[in-house]
C-alpha cells in the first residue's frame, strides 16, 4: 500500500519522494511500538492487575497525536491522488476513443471486403446463370451497403459509387431474368393492332416451358421456379406476377368471359404446355356463368400445375424468407378486375327477367359457390365471401333492379316511338290486358261477412233505373299503338309484382309510377314540334293522355289486394296522377285549337273586311278567304276523323266554325254602307258557308252516319242561327226585318241586339221615312 501511495505521489511536484517515504517508515515503526506497548499494558491491566492508569493515559495522548498525523497525511494523499486521477482518466478516454475509431475503420474495411466479395461471387454465379446464388450474393452486397450507409463517418462519394454499382448489377440480373422469363413464358399475339376481335383472340397463344431443351446448340434455360425465386429474393416477384396477371386477364380470361363462342384449348408437348383458343358456334350473346366459370377453371388449373404450384420454398433459408404462394399473389393482382368482368359480362345477363325463373337461378348460385371454393383450394383467393358470390346471392335485389331498369327502358322506347301509328279503342274493343288473379279467399270471406253484417236489415237499395253499361267506358277513338303497349307494360309489371318478394314488389310498383311520371316529362318534350305543327298528332296525344288517365283511375284498385302487405295501406294508387294527365292532353289540344283559330282569323283578315263587294277585286279576295277557311276546316275534319271521340270532334269543329262565322258577322255588321249589289254578294258568301259548313262535321268514316251530326250543327256552333238571320237580313225588306224582330220577340231579336239591327238597317237602306219608321220599331 505504501509503495502504491509513494508511486502516486512521485508524480506530484509538491512532495518529495524521500521525505515522504521516511516519514511513512517512521510512522510505521512508531505504530508498531505503540501497539506493543498497548498490548503490554492491556496484559498487565487485565492479566497481571497492575495499577497502570497513569501510563495508560500517556499512551492515549500519544495515540491521539498519532491519529491526527495520520488523518492529515491521508487528506494530503487524497488531494494529490484525485488531481492525478483526473489527468489519467482524460488520457484513458482519448485512448479509448482512438481504439473505437480504429475498430470502426476496421469494421468498414471488413464490410467493404464483404461487399466486394459478394459482387465477385454474384458475377460468377450470374455468368453461369445460377440466378438464386447470384440473387443472394446481391442481397448480401445490399446488406453490406446498408451497414456502410449507417456509418455517418463514411465517405459519401464512395457510398454513391457503391450504390450506383449495386443498382447497375441489380438491373443487370433483372435484365437477364426478364430475358429468360420471356423464353419460359412465351406470348404470341396477332399482327393486327385490334386485339379485341374474335379473329385476333384466335391467334393469341400462351406457351409455358416445362423441361430443358435437349439440343446441344441451345443454351439450357433455368427452371421457372429458379427464375421466380430469384425474382422473389430481389423483391421483384409481385411486380412480375402482377404484369403477367394483367396480360393473362386481358388476352385470355376476359375474352373467355365476354365471348360465348370462344373456348380455351390446352396443347401439351414434351417440353411445353400451350393455351390457345378455338371458336364454337353458339346463339348466345353472353356466356352463362357456369360456362364462364368452367373456362376460367380450365386455364387456372393449367397455370396451377405448370407455374403457380412450383416448389419455391425448398432453397430458401429457414426463417429468412416467408413461404411464397404464387397463386395468392396472382389472385391479389387480378381477382378484383376478373370478378368485376364476370359480374358485368355474365351474372348481370343471367338475372331472370321473370319472377317465375328465380328458382332456376339457384343453379347459378351453386356454380358460383363451387367456383369460389375451387379458387380458395388453389389458394388463389383467401378470406371471406367475395363480391362475386355476394352479387350472385343477392338475386332478389338484382332481379328487382334489372326488372325496373328494363321496364323504364322499354317504356322510354315506347314513348319516343312514332305517335301516328294508332289502334282503335272503345267500349266494344277489348284491350289485350293481362288477366288478374283473384284475391285471397280469406279476404273475400272477410269482405262478405262485413257486408252481410252491415246490410242485413237494409231494404231494397237498388235504384229504379240502372246506369248504362258503358257509362264509365272510354269513348271510341284512336290512340297510339305505343301507348297501348305502354299500358300493357304497366299491367304486366304490376302483375309481376303480385308474385314477387315484398322488396321487389315495392320497387316494381314505384317503377310503374315512374313510367307515368316519365311519360309526363318525355313525350311533350320529345314530340314538341310535331305536336305543335300536326293537328292529327295533337289529337292522338290528347286521346293518349285521356286513355292513360282512364286506366289510372282503377289501376291501383285492381291490384290493391294482390300486392305486398306494405303496399296495401292506401299507397297502392295512381289516382293522384289522373288530373295531371288530363291537363296534359287538354293543354296540348287547346294549344292546337288556338293555332287553328289563329290561322282561320289570318285567312279572313285577307277578305278586306268584306267592304265594297261591288268591286271585283274585293269580292275575289273575300271569296278566296272564305274558300280557304272552309278548306282548312274540311282538312281538319279529315285528319281528326275517326281519331277524336265524336263529342270532342264535334265540339272542336263547332268551335272553329263558330270562330270563322263570328269573325264574318263582326266584319259585316261593322259595315256602314251596304249597296244592293254588296248585299247580294255578301249573301252569296254567307250562303257558301251555310251550305258547306255542315259538311266539315264528319267524325266517322261512314258518310251516312255523319248526317246526324251535320244536322245538329246549331248545337255545336252557337253563332249558326244568328248567322242565318244575318243572311236573311241581307236579302230582306224593311217589312220582313220588322216582322222578324216582332217587337223584340222574334228570331232576329234573339240573334242580334237592337243596336246591331239598327246599324244593319242604316247600312242596307237609304234614309227614308220607311227606314225611320222601321228603326223606330227596333227597341
From Swiss-Prot:
It comes from the Eukaryota. The keyword Phosphoprotein applies. The modification Phosphoserine is found at residues 3, 12. Pfam families: ZW10_C (PF20666), ZW10_C2 (PF22766), Zw10_middle (PF20665), Zw10_N (PF06248). Residues 2-81 are annotated as: Interaction with ZWINT. Residues 14-130 form a coiled coil. It is found in: Cytoplasm; Endoplasmic reticulum membrane; Chromosome, Centromere, Kinetochore; Cytoplasm, Cytoskeleton, Spindle. The modification N6-acetyllysine is found at residue 777. The modification N-acetylalanine is found at residue 2. Residues 2-317 are annotated as: Interaction with RINT1. The keyword ATP-binding does not apply. It is a peripheral membrane protein. GO terms for cellular component: cytosol; Dsl1/NZR complex; endoplasmic reticulum; endoplasmic reticulum membrane; kinetochore; kinetochore microtubule; lipid droplet; nucleus. Keywords: Acetylation, Cell cycle, Cell division, Centromere, Chromosome, Coiled coil, Cytoplasm, Cytoskeleton, Endoplasmic reticulum, ER-Golgi transport, Kinetochore, Lipid droplet, Membrane, Mitosis, Phosphoprotein, Protein transport, Transport. Essential component of the mitotic checkpoint, which prevents cells from prematurely exiting mitosis. Required for the assembly of the dynein-dynactin and MAD1-MAD2 complexes onto kinetochores. Its function related to the spindle assembly machinery is proposed to depend on its association in the mitotic RZZ complex. Involved in regulation of membrane traffic between the Golgi and the endoplasmic reticulum (ER); the function is proposed to depend on its association in the interphase NRZ complex which is believed to play a role in SNARE assembly at the ER. Belongs to the ZW10 family. Interacts with NBAS and KNTC1/ROD; the interactions are mutually exclusive and indicative for its association in two different vesicle tethering complexes. Component of the RZZ complex composed of KNTC1/ROD, ZW10 and ZWILCH. Component of the NRZ complex composed of NBAS, ZW10 and RINT1/TIP20L; NRZ associates with SNAREs STX18, USE1L, BNIP1/SEC20L and SEC22B (the assembly has been described as syntaxin 18 complex). Interacts directly with RINT1/TIP20L bound to BNIP1/SEC20L. Interacts with C19orf25 and ZWINT. Interacts with ZFYVE1. This is Centromere/kinetochore protein zw10 homolog. The gene is Zw10.
